Amino acid sequence: MRNPTFGIIVWLGRLMRLPQLSYICIVMLRLKTLTILGSRAELASLPDGKLLINTVNAHSFNTAQKDSLFAEALQQGDVLIPDGVSIVKACKWIKAKSQPTERVAGWDLFAFEMDRLEHRAKELANAADAATGKLPLKVMFMGSSPKVLSLIEKRAAVDYPHLKVVTYSPPYKPEFTDEDNKAIIEAINSANPDLLWIGMTAPKQEKWTYAHWHELNIHCHVGTIGAVFDFYAGTVERAPLWWQEHGLEWAYRLMKEPRRMWRRYILGNVLFLWNMTKE
């Protein structure tokens, strides 16, 4: 006789329009064996050079169970940060290989990397650069809309005055053509940034970056940070500090955007718990 819990999960998978979750037989991604960054302090120990940094939370973990390329992208990236209290707690519960001590949000990664690059740029600045108006280091934002990127440029000019900001808005479509991909790659390689942010929402941003990683002739940290573009631009409000500190940022987003977020957080959290029972 079939376990009634299984029937509930099948129903949830169909309700979330994730039919593959109706057949929970093949596990694409295992939290127990993932290598995950332990804390915000460990960001300072990341090596220089070309480095792919992705994030994982309950939603992306669920999505990876039905998307083999996304699962591979998360596993094969250089650094995976725990962007969710659910990940931190689940790692303890299942006695995973990695035991992160705190949530490291995409915003934490963004703030750390931007501050570090600004500090380096300030040290490199000299009288000649100041006279010509040349900025020594460059950060690139690839993704989102021209409007959001324009707002990012304006804010970054104030927050990080020693950095040159370069942006590229790809076509807004579910999948890029070969011509689209070529144009994006050429834009990134031509810019040759000292820090690259990819913001096209998960799983698109992780899959695209992973698929084209060897075509990117750059030598810098690359972070896939999605919603941070909107947070930094101010087009989407981030949860107040109290909600963040108590691991309730997801609840705040659900409260602000219930129609868009209810599947992700209400049904998705149940599915995540079910996935943890299989670990």
What residue spans do the PLM features occupy?
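N-terminal nucleotide/polyanion-binding subdomain common to many enzyme families
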Residues: 22-111
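Conserved beta-alpha
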Residues: 94-123, 133-187, 191
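Short, flexible loop segments at boundaries between secondary-structure elements
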Residues: 170-175, 218-255
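A transmembrane-helix-recognition feature enriched in membrane-embedded lipid enzymes
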Residues: 88-89, 238-279
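Proline-aspartate-enriched helix->loop->beta-strand connector
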Residues: 188, 192-197, 201-202, 209
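Short, low-complexity intrinsically disordered segments enriched in A/P/G/S/L with frequent Arg
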Residues: 3, 17-21, 130-131
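Short Gly/Ser/Thr- and charged-rich N-terminal loops/segments
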Residues: 11-14, 126-127, 131-132
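Compositionally biased, intrinsically disordered low-complexity segments enriched in Pro/Arg/Gln/His
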Residues: 15-18, 119
